[in-house]
């Protein structure tokens, strides 16, 4: 089996600085939980934008961000914007462990997911592995829940979580604030607390603050 796989992130791990907390350990901006990191702490070999068949949605309650978590329903109609990171197999296994608040270090058998497209490690929210195919000779794997997006109530994401989603979509797909706001607002669960207008306002305000922070000081 290949020694590297594409980890297809569709949530906050699209944002590279957020992913680094999973790889090297640390607490993400706006997060409440410190992650231990992977056995192999190097960054991804490559990161590329991808579009997955299926639907992103928000449900349950995140201990890290509060608000809804992002999940992926591969059986629903639609498309999901993602960012694939080329990582080692042990890194992928350790990311999966941390998604379930477990101690990393246990290798997973990925053969069923790679061969048959899906495998279930357990009943937990991030214990279903989905292989959407291959890209440049490496399997594309992602992590999600066993249920359909219609199986449980939606829960809108927090503003902090939206900031990481937006940063990841900007880095990978080069989307504008308007494109990001329209995309997130139309994911099931998000509409319970957000509109495209309110998301754009939050992201626009953050962009202005960032610009002011990095602007060179003027002397008189």
Regions found by a protein language model. Give the residues of each.
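Glycine-aromatic micro-motifs
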Residues: 2-220
């Amino acid at each position: 089996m290949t020694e590297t796989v594409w980890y297809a992130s569709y949530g906050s791990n699209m944002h590279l600085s957020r992913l680094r907390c999973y790889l090297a350990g640390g607490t993400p901006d706006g997060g409440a939980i410190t992650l231990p990191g992977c056995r192999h702490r190097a960054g991804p070999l490559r990161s590329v934008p991808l579009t997955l068949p299926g639907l992103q949605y928000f449900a349950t309650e995140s201990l890290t961000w509060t608000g809804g978590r992002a999940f992926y329903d591969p059986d629903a109609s639609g498309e999901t914007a993602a960012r694939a990171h080329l990582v080692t197999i042990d890194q992928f296994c350790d990311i999966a462990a941390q998604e379930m608040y477990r101690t990393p270090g246990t290798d997973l058998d990925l053969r069923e997911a790679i061969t048959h497209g899906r495998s279930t490690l357990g009943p937990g929210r991030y214990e279903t592995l989905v292989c959407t195919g291959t890209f440049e000779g490496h399997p594309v794997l992602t992590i999600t829940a066993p249920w359909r997006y219609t199986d449980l109530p939606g829960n809108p994401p927090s503003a902090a979580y939206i900031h990481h989603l937006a940063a990841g979509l900007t880095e990978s797909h080069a989307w504008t604030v308007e494109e990001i706001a329209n995309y997130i607002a139309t994911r099931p669960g998000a509409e319970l607390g957000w509109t495209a207008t309110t998301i754009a306002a939050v992201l626009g305000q953050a962009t202005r603050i960032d610009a002011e922070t990095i602007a060179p000081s003027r002397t008189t």
